[in-house]
Amino acid sequence: LLDSAGGMAIAAEKPDPRAVIQHAREHSVGVMGIRAVAAGSLTSVIDRPDAANSAEQIDFERAAPFRLIAAEMGISPAQLAHQYALSMPGVETLVLGVKNREELAECLAAEAAPDLDMSLMQRIDAAVRD
C-alpha cells in the first residue's frame, strides 16, 4: 500500500520505488519523494469528488490500520505519512501537494519531528503490506 501507484498505475509491472531509492543511495544520489499521502489514501478522509470505487478509495480502505497507528501516536495520518517518507533512508525531500493551511501545518510538523524509528516503520509496513 505504501508503494501503491494508485490511479497513476499505467504499466503492467508493479512499481518498486524502494528498489529505486536503494539504487540511488548506492550511487550517492538523493531522492525527492512524491505522493507521500498516496493521493489521499493515507489521510483522515478522501476529499476527491470521484473517489468512489477508485484505486485511491481502495487504498484508503486498506489503510485503516495505518490510521489506527497514527491515532495511537496522537497525530494525523497525513503527518505520519510524511514522517514515514522523510524517515526512509535515501529520501532527501518531498514534493508537497497541499490544498490548505491545515495540510501545510501537518507537513511542517512532520518535517520538524524526529525520524521514525525502524521498529515503528516495520510495524507500519506490516500493517499495510500488500
Q: What kind of feature is each model-predicted range?
A:
Residues 1-129:
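Beta/alpha (TIM)-barrel catalytic core signal, keyed to glycine-rich beta->alpha loops juxtaposed to Asp/Glu
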